[in-house]
């Protein structure tokens, strides 16, 4: 398997340059609540120019910073923000880094076409992850206030967590308000506005969009986006929604209805539960295990998935 991956890397990535990664062009994560983006989970997200997106919504993905990184990759320069991959490769032994796995999901033809484009060209991504805001009704133990309003409320009400034996626990001291710069309901958010403006074009070219949060079903922006998606048939698009499924009957029925109403290739719903009963409820504060299981069965039986 490793030999097959290294052969693929040499033929489709290293043929362009030793630092090339297709994810920097064809994948994007958009943190719309506070206006940040990245194209891989390893480099830290960077800010989106709010003035640029008013003129060109594609600047949500095609930031000046990201274009400079693409230029470096085309020229065989290894960007510092991608150091995780370089460390893996520098070990030797023909190690396979994440740039291979993150590029391999795209066709060789689409990857080869990237080297023919100007380094500063605006790219329509093929895969996208979007978080509209941090609104969430859970406070899971592995999460933090930057991704959950319930986490933030707990810290505001009870103060920051104490007596950590690590120096990297900053997320457990703050209430996460830094990620909610447009208020509780994310009104008049220029990043959301730009994304919705870009959607007619995206809807015809994206292969996959994943909606995460927070808890998407608790976000007004999520339901607004679902209404807009109905207006643009996307026969090649896969929609994936992350949900804790800790939902009341009205909301879970609404989610099921959406799966039937959208004209898309595929609707997938992702939910997680690491344990059973009380143990699960301890890990995911806010979880009612029986409700979660009931909703899961209902989605499996009734949704178009």
Language model features by range: what are they?
Residues 86-90, 143-149:
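Detector for the c-type heme attachment site
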């Amino acid at each position: 398997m490793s030999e097959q991956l290294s052969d693929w890397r040499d033929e489709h990535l290293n043929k362009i340059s030793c630092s090339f990664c297709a994810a920097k062009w064809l994948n994007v994560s958009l943190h719309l609540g506070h206006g940040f983006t990245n194209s891989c989970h390893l480099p830290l997200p960077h800010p989106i120019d709010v003035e640029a997106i008013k003129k060109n919504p594609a600047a949500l993905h095609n930031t000046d910073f990201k274009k400079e990184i693409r230029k470096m990759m085309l020229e065989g320069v290894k960007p510092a923000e991608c150091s995780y991959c370089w460390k893996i490769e520098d070990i030797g032994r023909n190690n396979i880094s994440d740039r291979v796995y993150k590029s391999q999901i795209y066709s060789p033809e689409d990857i080869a076409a990237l080297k023919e484009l100007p380094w500063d060209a605006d790219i329509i991504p093929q895969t996208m992850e979007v978080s509209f805001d941090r609104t969430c009704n859970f406070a899971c133990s592995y999460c933090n206030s930057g991704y959950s309003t319930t986490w933030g409320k707990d810290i505001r009400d009870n103060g920051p967590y104490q007596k950590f034996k690590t120096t990297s626990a900053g997320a457990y001291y703050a209430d996460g308000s830094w990620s909610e710069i447009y208020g509780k309901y994310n009104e008049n958010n220029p990043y959301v506005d730009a994304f919705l403006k870009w959607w007619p074009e995206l809807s015809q070219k994206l292969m996959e969009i994943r909606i995460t949060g927070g808890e998407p079903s608790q976000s007004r922006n999520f339901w607004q986006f679902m209404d807009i998606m109905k207006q643009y048939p996307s026969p090649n698009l896969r929609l994936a929604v992350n949900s804790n499924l800790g939902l009341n009957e009205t909301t879970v029925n609404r989610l099921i209805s959406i799966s039937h109403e959208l004209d898309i290739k595929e609707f997938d719903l992702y939910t997680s539960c690491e344990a059973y009963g009380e143990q699960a409820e301890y890990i995911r504060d806010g979880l009612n295990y029986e409700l979660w299981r009931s909703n899961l069965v209902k989605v499996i039986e009734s949704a178009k998935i």
